[in-house]
């Protein structure tokens, strides 16, 4: 179990480092004690958070409402809770 990703009952909790304004959306891999995710949205008016939520929901095959930002609403370092994921992306499963 990594410090970046852990299971909490049925949920998965992710400690993330976000890279906004990237060329494409991608789960990059470990970045120190966090999982790095690159997203195309700019960090303006909550666009990056909305885009991140949508991207993670698609990756874990769940509704956007089941992705919760627990910490780091306004920063690049975030803690995200994924409720009852249907699928776990290979990049996440490798460090779980």
Swiss-Prot record:
GO cellular component: cytoplasm
TM region positions: none
Gene3D superfamilies found in the cross-reference section: YggU-like (3.30.1200.10)
Leader peptide range in chain numbering: none
PANTHER family the record matches: UPF0235 PROTEIN C15ORF40
Similarity remark: Belongs to the UPF0235 family.
HAMAP family in the cross-refs: UPF0235
Name of the protein in its database record: UPF0235 protein VP2619
């Amino acid at each position: 179990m990594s410090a970046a990703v852990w299971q909490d009952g049925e949920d998965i909790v992710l400690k993330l480092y976000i890279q906004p304004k990237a060329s494409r959306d991608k789960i990059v891999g470990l970045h120190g004690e966090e999982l790095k995710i690159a997203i195309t949205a700019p960090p303006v008016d909550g666009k990056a958070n909305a885009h991140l939520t949508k991207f993670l929901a698609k990756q874990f095959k769940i509704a956007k409402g089941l992705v919760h930002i627990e910490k780091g609403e306004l920063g690049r370092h975030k803690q995200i809770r994924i409720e009852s994921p249907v699928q776990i992306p290979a990049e996440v499963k490798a460090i779980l």
